[in-house]
Amino acid sequence: MAYPFQLGLQDATSPIMEELLHFHDHTLMIVFLISSLVLYIISLMLTTKLTHTSTMDAQEVETVWTILPAIILILIALPSLRILYMMDEINNPSLTVKTMGHQWYWSYEYTDYEDLNFDSYMIPTQELKPGELRLLEVDNRVVLPMEMTVRMLISSEDVLHSWAVPSLGLKTDAIPGRLNQTTLMAMRPGLYYGQCSEICGSNHSFMPIVLEMVPLSYFETWSAVMV
């Protein structure tokens, strides 16, 4: 979850988010090494008079500064492509939930159940209970089973929206007339918050997302009550 004044990324709750965190650290280390090398060279240029002003040709140096960046780009591209393919892969989902974006709320439909659907609106600040988060709580949470693959079908009724939950590494555009899909799997129970991540009008900041990941037995009880 997120914490006040947090500087880093949220804790990973899904295998995809764990991979994204590892890739972030991998890329950041490469950027740090390159930046350190550049700063070292600049400091040498500023503190020494040993400059090669008469050098006209240096094929060895040109070869190094051509091949080395290519190798670095490959080291960044290969894990990135692997994660992209993992995010697009859908393996026998146990449950499908259709999500529709509206100005300015979300509606959800559990397609595996005959009549299980609801709208999800943000709870106004004056109606919050002690311990609830401002601008992030909703009147109807999306309850899903943990440790199971869930497919989300995402679209929009009016303008562009984006369905995003950072702890799960999810961000999928909701486009009118187009059905996008993504998968999620939470490794532990809890409440996971997100928000619309595409500017969609005056109340864009007031359409949060709340996922409640629970054990399968609790989900079956909840779905039986809702239906």
UniProtKB/Swiss-Prot annotation:
Key word Metal-binding present: yes
One Gene Ontology molecular-function label: cytochrome-c oxidase activity
Membrane topology, as annotated: Multi-pass membrane protein
Taxonomic superkingdom: Eukaryota
Topological domains, Mitochondrial intermembrane: 1-14, 88-227
List of residues that carry Phosphotyrosine: Y218
Enzyme class: translocase
EC number(s) on file: 7.1.1.9
All ranges on the Mitochondrial matrix side of the membrane: 46-59
Chain sites annotated for binding Cu cation A1: H161, C196, C200, M207
Pfam families assigned: COX2, COX2_TM
Name the record gives this protein: Cytochrome c oxidase subunit 2
Organism of provenance: Lycalopex griseus (Argentine gray fox)
